[in-house]
Amino acid sequence: MTTNIHDQRILILDFGSQYTQLIARRVREIGVYCELWAWDVTEEQIREFNPNGIILSGGPESVHAKDSPRAPQYVFDAGVPVFGICYGMQTMAEQLGGAVLGSDMREFGYAQVEVVEQMALLNNIEDHVSPNGNALLDVWMSHGDKVAAVPDGFITAAKTDSCPFAAIVHPEKQFYGVQFHPEVTHTRQGQRMLSHFVLDICQCEKLWTPDAIIEDAVARMKKQIGDDEVILGLSGGVDSSVVAMLLHRAIGKNLTCVFVDNGLLRLNEGQQVMDMFGDHFGLNIIKIDAEERFLSALAGTDEPEAKRKIIGRVFVEVFDEESKKLKNAKWLAQGTIYPDVIESAGSATGKAHVIKSHHNVGGLPDDMAMGLVEPLRELFKDEVRKIGLELGLPYDMLYRHPFPGPGLGVRVLGEVKKEYCDLLRRADAIFIDELHKHDLYNKVSQAFTVFLPVKSVGVMGDARKYDWVVSLRAVETIDFMTAHWAHLPYEFLGKVSNRIINEIDGISRVVYDISGKPPATIEWE
């Protein structure tokens, strides 16, 4: 009998912090299931979820602003421990009768808090010791307002010179609040604080482990699918690859994978996918060579968003045609992951702005009349990778740098042509090859080459040449929300440039992109 890995759970209410998903990932890393919901959740939904504890995230608002978000009153009446982080602490303090002081001065960055009263959340945690013998903690602050008076029953557990209530606790109700962010790595022992809350205070067991997740997913899919057949669009990316391996374990030959080669993939990628999943793992896999169809549809289009939509539309058409040939397939599998679910759910009162449209199979026709199988919809990307390793997928494939859904369609600037894609594929392969050879690949977060639709004069021997330009792009980032351009050695960049120009007829110049994010995005389109 499989363990109920969802039996013990933490609810995280999102007040808009850029770090909120990080809180959820940290709780999962501890080994406990959690879900992330918008702050305006109803009492009925909380009751139904029945959490062992609740975490209130940070957020950009001031509790003094009109219509600023508040925790549902039931959070404080549910009889479970509550942990307020930054804004979460402020709204808890004000809602329970304390006072929050507005401030035009933000405290942002490293700070040192002094523990003045022991509490379970900070038990046996110290980074330094103060002259009077108290524990000092290295933490990360990001706030404007601050608590000025604690509600009845609360005591002060930690302070800084500028923040007298850096950590507070209601010992009887087990309500905790901190003005810093334990979820970020800059708070040196933040993970221990979260672990104290989840394991010691909420008394959850570590049931959420890769092998248990696999066992649970396989059991649920067997129950859902039975003896039916399933079709999966396999791209060779992390998500669809892990879905393929999970389904193969659950239903074996009743899975058919469809791999659409759109002509916008990396060098030899199509053959690598077929070799790995067809020959090595023994999956049923159909390869569709659709390069000409995609490039014909893209001809004459140079606007990035229009290109994305065309690539998505043509994929749906090709996949739909192939699925209709598989008359026994009653289920469609997708690699939806938890951040996709969070993004789709949103807040009942929130607003969102699309910077770039996401490329996935979400737009499949209504008349496909298939059930949906989404075994990864509870998982974050880092969890998907861990599952993939457990299932036998190679590390190099699972931890490869991100590749956009539209592929080279958004790395060839302007109109996409076969000539441009072929040149770009080879140039990019040289860049990645040299990164591996110089042990730099895993030291940057993402690296790729971009084709620029401009020609430049060059000299090769005694001959003048007039050929295309490519740009190398490499960035360092923790969360891909902000990024620095990677300071790769000049000698290395020179070697990559020489190889590209000497080995590829058609490229005369190589440049290096030194733009950060912001203001630039990581991808050029």
Curated annotation (Swiss-Prot):
GO terms for cellular component: cytosol. The keyword Ribonucleoprotein does not apply. CDD domains: GATase1_GMP_Synthase, GMP_synthase_C. GO terms for molecular function: ATP binding; GMP synthase activity. Pathway: Purine metabolism; GMP biosynthesis; GMP from XMP (L-Gln route): step 1/1. The keyword DNA damage does not apply. Transmembrane segments: none annotated. The active site is at 86 (nucleophile), 181, 183. Disulfide bonds: none annotated. Its EC number is 6.3.5.2. PROSITE patterns: GATASE_TYPE_1, GMPS_ATP_PPASE. Keywords: ATP-binding, Glutamine amidotransferase, GMP biosynthesis, Ligase, Nucleotide-binding, Purine biosynthesis. ATP binds at residues 235-241. It holds the Pfam family GATase. Residues 208-400 form the GMPS ATP-PPase domain. InterPro entries: Class_I_gatase-like, GATASE, GMP_synth_C, GMP_synth_GATase, GMP_synthase, GMPS_ATP_PPase_dom, NAD/GMP_synthase, Rossmann-like_a/b/a_fold. Catalyzes the synthesis of GMP from XMP. Homodimer. This is GMP synthase [glutamine-hydrolyzing]. It comes from Pseudoalteromonas atlantica (strain T6c / ATCC BAA-1087).
